[in-house]
Design a protein with these regions (language model features):
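N-terminal auxiliary segments of SAM/dcSAM-dependent transferases
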Residues: 1-48
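A short glycine-rich, Lys/Arg-flanked "PGG" loop and its adjoining helix->strand segment in the class I
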Residues: 168-183
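Acidic carboxylate diad motif detector
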Residues: 186-188
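Hydrophobic beta-strand segment of the Class I
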Residues: 85, 154-156
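Short, glycine-/aromatic-enriched active-site segment of Class I SAM-dependent methyltransferases
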Residues: 190-211
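Short alpha-helix
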Residues: 212-228
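Class I SAM-dependent methyltransferase SAM/SAH-binding core
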Residues: 65, 72, 80-145, 169
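A short His-aromatic
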Residues: 162-163, 210
Length: 228
């Protein structure tokens, strides 16, 4: 019970502090949010084709350097010109940039993040990518996003919701801001089966790491069913 209390009370502050420092320092050595060649590191993304060469050519260096994603939600969301997209946990803006190119000048992309320096980096990214006019950013907790009901055609998120202690609340917000018939495109970390308790405890102790807040795949899908 004590461990759960620590997670609920402190995990947001831990994540915010870690990722804000990472963004402030530019993502260089000693400022890595997810350590090593994990599925959420830039080197992994390049070597394993999470993003195509064409996509990477559209992305400013700072956005990719600070990317800690585990997938490419803007790539599989089937984004169409003119659509409105919200990125939950946009970080330095790699997926905001890619989504903005897909929805074009008639569309709009809103990036949401709780870390001030990541928001600043994201603004830098969209300016360098020449998509600032169709993008905007909100500094907000994903459990309380200041956007109206039925705002977006698509909500995307990349390796972020696993870090949120109250995943149900985050998904309630995602479904709230979606239009009727809207779409979710989520890349995230889950446990695929039985996990050694000691291994899991080690991951949970480092909540800001890539696997810290992960839950079982079955439970993850149950949350989606319950709130959506």
């Amino acid at each position: 019970m004590e461990t759960e209390t620590i997670k609920a009370g402190d995990s947001k502050d831990i994540v915010k502090s870690r990722y804000d420092a990472c963004a402030e320092q530019g993502g260089g050595e000693g400022a890595v949010c997810c350590a090593g060649d994990t599925p959420a590191s830039p080197s992994f993304a390049a070597e394993h084709g999470l993003y195509s060469r064409e996509e990477l050519s559209l992305v400013p260096k700072i956005a990719f350097t600070l990317s800690r994603g585990c997938g490419n939600p803007a790539g599989f969301a089937d984004l169409q010109p003119g659509e409105v997209v919200v990125d939950f946990g946009c970080g330095a803006g790699i997926d905001v940039v890619l989504a903005a190119h897909k929805v074009g000048p008639a569309g709009k992309v809103v990036g949401v993040d709780m870390t001030p320096h990541m928001i600043e980096r994201a603004k830098q990214s969209v300016a360098e990518a020449h998509v600032a006019e169709t993008t905007e950013f909100l500094l907000a907790d994903l459990e309380q996003v200041e956007l109206p009901d039925g705002f977006a055609d698509v909500v995307i998120s990349n390796c972020v919701i696993n870090l949120c202690p109250d995943k149900e609340a985050v998904y309630r917000e995602a479904f709230r801001v979606l239009k009727p018939g809207g779409r979710l495109a989520i890349s995230d970390i889950v446990y695929g089966g039985e996990t050694d308790p000691q291994v899991r405890e080690r991951f949970q102790a480092n909540w800001a790491g890539c696997v810290g807040g992960a839950i079982e795949e079955d439970r993850y899908f149950q949350i989606l069913q319950d709130v959506g």
